[in-house]
Amino acid sequence: MITANLSENQLLIKKIIDVSLNIILSYLYTLIIATLYCNIRAAKHIPKYNKDYVIILGSKINEDGTLTPLLKARTDKAIEFGKNQLKATNKQIIYIPSGGKGVDEKVSEAQAIKNYLIKEGIAPDRILVEDKSINTRQNMQFSKKIINETNKDAKISFSTTNYHVFRSGVIASNCGIDCEGMG
């Protein structure tokens, strides 16, 4: 009888563990699917063409001070958005390249982006450089400070890599920035 009870207790414990694991795994699968859904939706989002500023989030640059393919894609997306907005609304956008200088970089990420913007035909007076930040939170905080110096009610967008849009949007929101991202 003791052996039978022990087996029943072991079976009960096994069932409890199985049910608990199924609940945990179901929760994790749901969390993963929800995260993927949010990231895909954010990456495919195109901001409204009513923006005053576009913050271009920095990333590592090449040794010669030029943009890596990843950073070039972010910058090209911002340029494309600015051109499309101009066509749609006749409203010029101000570009804010954002990113500090790494120890192994010749110039700041922001300066490298600015150089590329000018090379691509963007007028220097439409570029405000934020070159102190070392992470996405600082990109947003320091860029917001620059924007607030001229326009506290500005409509803002940001450009980053598609897989980074959702996370950057959350960080921007936590920094008190109402903006739309693109990637």
Q: What residue spans do the PLM features occupy?
A:
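Transmembrane alpha-helices and immediately adjacent membrane-cytoplasm interface residues
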Residues: 2-42
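A structural signal for short, hydrophobic/glycine-enriched beta-strand patches
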Residues: 36, 43-183
